[in-house]
Design a protein with these regions (language model features):
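A short catalytic or substrate-binding loop motif that flags glycine-/basic-rich loops and adjacent residues
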Residues: 73-75, 138-141
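Surface-exposed loop/turn segments and immediately adjacent short secondary-structure elements
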Residues: 1-94, 108
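Structured beta-strand/turn binding interfaces of compact recognition modules in eukaryotic regulators
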Residues: 84-86, 104, 135
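Conserved catalytic palm subdomain of right-hand nucleotidyl-transferase polymerases, strongest
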Residues: 36-43, 92-101, 142-167
Length: 167
């Protein structure tokens, strides 16, 4: 472990450990998509955004208690896992993909934490990595590998040899 450099500076660590604020909760609520599928609570984020002036104080207190004190209501962690079709009129299980439908409270907590992490992630994750970065997906690497193999196969058929790779 001594040979692995520490990438999280004292300043980053202090920023991550700061007490979460009402402003962070407000920002998260209004950054999120209002019409995403609801979880077991049955509530769309649209409800929270529309009635935030009425319910914002109480919801924020609950979220801040969770984030700052670690008191996370058990029911907030309930999630539905369901299958959604990948194609029109699927006939095989493989033509579905699973998604998790989380409670809105859980989604807001996650967004507040994600916003806090966004400030330091570029310092911790290489730009060449395709996961955990905005506008990138881990599946991008699969496409690059497929295209590389396809190109190599075509080169082999033309008897031009293979490119060299360095690992």
């Amino acid at each position: 472990m001594a040979d692995i450099p520490c990438l999280v500076t004292t300043e980053m660590n202090n920023m991550l450990q700061m007490v979460y604020t009402r402003e962070e909760v407000d920002r998260a609520v209004f950054q999120m998509e209002a019409l995403k599928a609801p979880g077991p609570d049955g509530l769309l984020l649209l409800f929270f955004q529309h009635y935030w002036k009425i319910i914002g104080d109480e919801v924020s207190v609950a979220i801040l208690n969770c984030l700052n004190l670690g008191s996370f209501p058990q029911s907030s962690n309930n999630t539905f896992i369901t299958l959604i079709p990948k194609v029109k009129s699927p006939s095989l299980v493989s033509k579905f993909r699973p998604i998790s439908l989380c409670n809105t409270f859980y989604k807001i907590v996650s967004k507040v934490v994600a916003n806090r992490l966004k400030g330091i992630l570029p310092n911790l994750i290489s730009e060449s990595q395709s996961a955990f970065q905005t506008d990138k997906a881990i599946s991008d690497n699969i496409l690059v590998a497929f295209e590389t193999l396809h190109h190599m196969k075509n080169q082999k058929l033309k008897k031009k040899g293979f490119p060299g790779f360095k690992a």
